[in-house]
Amino acid sequence: MEVKGIINAIKKSMKDKDYDFVPTSKNRSSRHKYGLTQYDIEEFIASLEEEDIIKGPEVDRDYPDEELFIFKKEIIKDVKFYVKVKYKNNQIKIISCHEDE
């Protein structure tokens, strides 16, 4: 999938609330640290654009037949979040969404 395709898939998935969000401790910790709601995260991810991508498509080392896309974008003033997604089974899977390190 090309970058434009993943952006369109992300926007559609967020609009339809049809996505899988992996609940890692790092994802939860960043959300709580900044007082962000699930709605805030959905809006943020839906706002990703082509210029926010830093890597991708690239092969998922754990699942070589799948592609990953990595984004970085400011979510609130002076705070960038790292977002890693893949498109699997006609659905966006959000693997990471946390403060950039």
Q: What is the predicted function of each stretch?
A:
Residues 1-65:
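Compact soluble domain cores
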Residues 31, 72-73, 93:
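Functionally constrained cores in energy, signaling, and assembly domains
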Residues 61-87:
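Basic/aromatic recognition patch in beta-strand/loop cores that engages polyanionic ligands
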